[in-house]
Amino acid sequence: MSQARFIAFSDGSALVNPGGPGGTGYVVLDRARPAYRFGGTRWVEDGPNAVTNNRMELRAVLEALEGLPGGEAVQVISDSRYVVDALSRWIHGWRRKGWRTASGEPVLNRDLIEALDARARDLSVTYTWVRGHDGHAVNEVVDQLAQAAARGVAGPGEAEVVAALRAEAFLAGGPPAPRSSRA
């Protein structure tokens, strides 16, 4: 793991892909305090921006980065190769080619990718891929948050988030209750 001040775990879910409804889940840890926040959002979209798994994955990263102070280092951890590759590798070529893929097609989810690119300019963001459903406790919690948001039901609460952060040694001792929040 990097020594970034913020670690943002994110996941997205589409119950019907494409078409939704979908949900996002995230946990953001501020290692300088230590403090954390977590949440998720239910999404229903149609038309050209219909809910897909990839759109929900991108939205989850946007939600995680929201409100972070500029100039800070952030490590985004995702189980989506699409998110990690799109935002750390492919984006450079897409920009050079006028937002076209190698085959000349328009880049899908350009609106969200450009929004993330703009947000990342104010931060020092690195993207790390982890295998989903492979024992990463915080990744499992954000998956549950995204699934619950997509279904419109309550997801994991603070106790589950704290347990996951402790399991991966991101938190020691008790939870930073005075500074934690649910979005």
Curated annotation (Swiss-Prot):
It comes from the Bacteria. Its EC number is 3.1.26.4. It comes from Anaeromyxobacter dehalogenans (strain 2CP-C). InterPro entries: RNase_H, RNaseH-like_sf, RNaseH_domain, RNaseH_sf, RNaseHI. The keyword Isomerase does not apply. This is Ribonuclease H. Monomer. Belongs to the RNase H family. Mg(2+) 2 binds at residues 11, 143. Its cofactor is Mg(2+). Pfam families: RNase_H (PF00075). It catalyses: Endonucleolytic cleavage to 5'-phosphomonoester. The lineage of its organism: Bacteria, Pseudomonadati, Myxococcota, Myxococcia, Myxococcales. Keywords: Cytoplasm, Endonuclease, Hydrolase, Magnesium, Metal-binding, Nuclease. Gene3D superfamilies: Ribonuclease H-like superfamily/Ribonuclease H (3.30.420.10). Endonuclease that specifically degrades the RNA of RNA-DNA hybrids.
